[in-house]
Amino acid sequence: MASHQDKASYQAGETKARTEEKTGQAVGATKDTAQHAKDRAADAAGHAAGKGQDAKEATKQKASDTGSYLGKKTDEAKHKAGETTEATKHKAGETTEAAKQKAGETTEAAKQKAGETTETTKQKAGETTEAARQKAADAMEAAKQKAAEAGQYAKDTAVSGKDKSGGVIQQATEQVKSAAAGRKDAVMSTLGMGGDNKQGDANTNTNTNTTKDSSTITRDH
């Protein structure tokens, strides 16, 4: 009976010991697991913190890099804008200078053209005036020549008419004198005065010559 109780006690003690051992092992394992979990959590937290710090630093660096990039781009844009503005000013200056030069050349060409036109007009006017004077002089000379010819023709016509008139008068006078002398001779012959007839003929011839001389003098005048 006692052996049976001792055995039961022994078994109970072993069971308790094993239970305690298992409990201790379980507790130790739990502690180990908890520590391991804690360590892992700490590592994770540290890693996360490191990542966060790294991310923060990376963000800062990125922001800095972005700021530097933007600043660089801004400076480049400003520089480019400055170059563009300077080039625009230079181009505008060249364009203005070219426009002024072109305007000056155009004005000078216009003045020269106007001067040439004025000179041509003066020359043409002078030529026209000279031609008009020459034409007037030629017309006046022609008029004088025609007037002289007309005067000469009138003079010649008058002299010719005078000569003709003088010839007709002289012829008529001679015919009248001849007829008168004939009648006188007939009368003298009838009266028997032939000697006187010769004297009368002499007188008649003298009168005839005198008349001819008078006619000649009149015709010459």
Swiss-Prot record:
Keywords per UniProt: Repeat
One of the record's GO cellular component terms: nucleus
Residue stretches of biased makeup (Polar residues): 212-221
Protein name per UniProt: Late embryogenesis abundant protein, group 3
Residue ranges, annotated region (Disordered): 1-221
Ranges annotated as biased composition (Low complexity): 43-52
PANTHER family with a match to the protein in the record: DAUER UP-REGULATED-RELATED, RE19971P
Family (UniProt): Belongs to the LEA type 4 family.
Biased composition (Basic and acidic residues): 33-42, 53-63, 72-147
